């Protein structure tokens, strides 16, 4: 899978990304059918190779390289499960939208 910033994640697994305002969270697909999917959160750890580049500004500081952040895969938390549904506008659950075939973890340091 090319749509990921999480290192060492299993290649044969299916993923989705939850869009949370400015942040992104990867989820693994546990159960799958055409109208409903059951997802579990992907556990990630900070990648020691990526260091945020902060500059003075904004509320406290501005992270200039946040778009290049990477994370390390640390498993899937199968105790927590959420159910998402296929709608006219794509995959969703309450107020969140989901992107298929994408495992992106993104923390917005500039929010």
Regions found by a protein language model. Name each.
Residues 1-26, 36-111:
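Mixed-charge, low-complexity intrinsically disordered regions
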